[in-house]
């Protein structure tokens, strides 16, 4: 039987438009001010040094780093330093009530149902763990983090790498064949399946005609107890 479900966020639990039309512009508008006001103290100075390490430029100036961050945002680069910085900026927005984390209406009832079945539920997203926690603790449905057993970001590996899913399995202590991954992205599901996981693809729009994964349009259609392991 399935013992753990790991779900993506963007396009899976959450409308992609919330991320691209609300979160990303909010962080972009405030990024330079956030960096310049805190460049001499933690956590900003540590994040800037992390970024210098990412781009292999230990002497990069703050101006150069800000330019790099804007470039990474334009490219939707999965930079750990950028994701952490965005998370700090989004925290202000969540706490101030500027927005709440969007969840599709079918998500929380399914999380409650699976939790009642003693299935552990984890989040795996390219967004930083702190940013993930903010979304689920300040969601449209309130704080639902009590339903979640843990969070993973790219520190366990990229989402299209097979090794990332093996790492998550080891960290949770759940064998790969008892892990179920939910995502809207075929290539991520391909990597999870190659690692030995079960997979279900969330299709919130048009079907993916190239996918070989089971496709559903709602969490209501996912019944882990019926998935053979």
Curated annotation (Swiss-Prot):
Alphabetical UniProt keywords: Amino-acid biosynthesis, Hydrolase, Magnesium, Metal-binding, Methionine biosynthesis
Biased composition (Polar residues): 208-218
Biological processes annotated in GO: L-methionine salvage from methylthioadenosine
Matches recorded under Pfam families: Hydrolase
Cofactor section: Mg(2+)
Molecular function in Gene Ontology: 2,3-diketo-5-methylthiopentyl-1-phosphate enolase activity; 2-hydroxy-3-keto-5-methylthiopentenyl-1-phosphate phosphatase activity; acireductone synthase activity; magnesium ion binding
SUPFAM superfamilies, per the entry: HAD-like
Bias-annotated ranges (Basic and acidic residues): 220-229
Family according to the record: Belongs to the HAD-like hydrolase superfamily. MasA/MtnC family.
Protein name as catalogued: Enolase-phosphatase E1
Gene (UniProt): mtnC
